[in-house]
Amino acid sequence: VTGIKMNIYLVRHTKPDVDAGVCYGLTDIDVADSFEAELCLLKDKIAHISQPLVFSSPLKRCSKLAEQLAAHLDATHVKTDVRLSELNFGDWELQNWADIPQGVVEEWTDDHIKQAPPNGESYIDLHHRAKQFFEELKSNQEGRHALVVTHAGVIRALVAEAMNLPLREACKVEVGYGSVTRIIIEDGVTQVAFVNR
């Protein structure tokens, strides 16, 4: 089939209600007080998307945003998917980075793609589940546009997947709060139109 085009808009959640320097990933942190202002900016960025399929991480910093954006775009409902959750930092969740022994953190940062924090998951684990979601989305919803509200780790993994980048390189991609990244799939070819807008 020719001419089938699908746009996938990856939206990072807005600023979370957490102090600077705190390690968080899978912890279900709420949105910050700036949510309404950030939401207004995002609504402008995505106003042109008509009735997309909307998917979200189940964490409230994403699902709250997804519900608002879905209503704004006349989307029927939001489908949450656990595979869109942020990296699980295990025992480090909600600890100050400064309080985690430096040697342990350095060991992890040297190979955080394959190494997992204690009782957490590695970036390869995250990439595996994000890729699985992406492949399903492409095959099941061909030709439909999708809005995916998720986390920086997942967005970087999906950009890596779309561009065939090594995961270590993907970690250099800047993904700001409330930013939009657009992936186009046309006639089976995947391209990244823009990142972090």
Regions found by a protein language model. Give the residues of each.
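Short active-site segment of divalent metal-dependent hydrolases/proteases
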Residues: 16, 154-155
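Short coil-to-beta-strand
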Residues: 5-14, 100-107
